[in-house]
Swiss-Prot record:
Gene3D superfamilies tied to this protein: NADP-dependent oxidoreductase domain (3.20.20.100)
Listed EC numbers: 1.-.-.-
Active site per the UniProt annotation: 50 (proton donor), 111 (proton donor)
Keyword terms: Cytoplasm, NADP, Nucleus, Oxidoreductase
Source organism, top-level taxon: Eukaryota
GO cellular component: cytosol; nucleus
Matches recorded under PANTHER family: 2,5-DIKETO-D-GLUCONIC ACID REDUCTASE, ALDO_KETO REDUCTASE FAMILY PROTEIN
Stated family: Belongs to the aldo/keto reductase family.
Organism name: Schizosaccharomyces pombe (strain 972 / ATCC 24843)
Localisation per UniProt entry: Cytoplasm; Nucleus
Any one GO molecular-function label of the UniProt entry: D-xylose reductase (NADPH) activity
Any Gene Ontology biological process: arabinose catabolic process
Swiss-Prot/TrEMBL site (Lowers pKa of active site Tyr) positions: 79
Protein name: Uncharacterized oxidoreductase C2F3.05c
């Protein structure tokens, strides 16, 4: 497999390097996930909102069957789209487990803070109790959203907060808060959807290490300790994105990359929502 693991606050080891399936064309999702698994990816990230849980699951099952890989050796993440309360969320958990066909989901996240997050969280806790979910967390939550959840005295503390993270978007207040609570950060859109390719400083650092801009941004997130979820539907780039474990960015260059921060969000940013 590619990369190492991060230990979550519930004791589980989660592969740090993941394949992100957001915005992967549905006609290409199965093949792209299968290609990622062939390249050594062992963490696949999906969501109800992506409408590809079934395609991801089929690719994982095919890979398991053809290689003899055990279910416990592949980590599957998905996310709840509609936070409509306890009963609705219980049904949504069942729907996701059925859709992926994997028997259980390793990590299930509240996709955003919008909706009834407290009651929906209680349903996720029930999913863990019933063995349908192994770990639970949140996505796009700001410190105030998480604190509200913690103030409700949950049985389970969120394991992960998945937010947009890359050199141009440090979200340091969110990172600092989560780290103070033992919540693992996961970086989506680590490549900024390509919107910052061509940046002179990024290009200079990429040239120095004889790596692509994408590889530098992925490596940056890994060295920050984040779970990282690069996305591509091109087999060559899927492989290239994983070729980031044969070098290390120096402390000086990590600081240069960090200083590129301009609070640039390539996607939505519910972290700042007052609701």
């Amino acid at each position: 497999m590619l990369g190492s693991f991060v230990k979550l606050n519930n004791g589980l080891k989660c592969p740090q390097f993941a394949y992100g399936s957001y915005m992967v064309n549905r006609t290409k999702c199965f093949d792209s996930v299968y290609a990622a698994l062939q390249c050594g990816y062992r963490h696949i990230d999906s969501a109800q909102m992506y409408h590809n849980e079934a395609d991801c699951g089929r690719a994982i099952l095919k890979f398991m069957e053809e290689t003899g890989t055990k279910r416990e050796d592949i980590w599957f993440t998905s996310k709840l789209n509609d936070l409509s309360g306890y009963k609705s969320t219980l049904s949504s958990i069942d729907a996701s487990v059925k859709a992926c066909g994997l028997g259980y989901i390793d990590l299930f996240l509240l996709h955003s803070p919008y909706g009834d997050r407290i009651e929906s969280w209680k349903a996720l806790e029930k999913g863990v109790e019933e063995g349908k979910l192994r770990a639970i967390g949140v996505s796009n939550f700001g410190p105030h959203h998480i604190q509200e959840l913690l103030d409700s005295h949950p049985k389970i503390i969120p394991c992960v907060n998945q937010i947009e993270l890359h050199p141009f978007c440090s979200q340091q207040k969110v990172v600092d808060y989560c780290e103070s609570k033992g919540i693992q950060l996961a970086a989506y859109a680590p490549l900024v959807h390509g919107e910052k390719f061509g940046n002179k400083q990024l290009l200079a650092i990429a040239s120095k290490y004889n790596k692509s801009e994408a590889q530098i941004m992925i490596r940056y997130c890994l060295q920050r300790g984040f779970i990282v979820l690069p996305k591509s539907s091109t087999p060559r780039r899927i492989k290239e994105n994983g070729d980031v474990f044969d070098f290390e960015i120096s402390k000086e260059d990590m600081e240069k990359l960090y200083n590129l921060d301009e609070d640039y969000h390539s996607d939505w940013n519910p972290c700042v929502s007052p609701l």
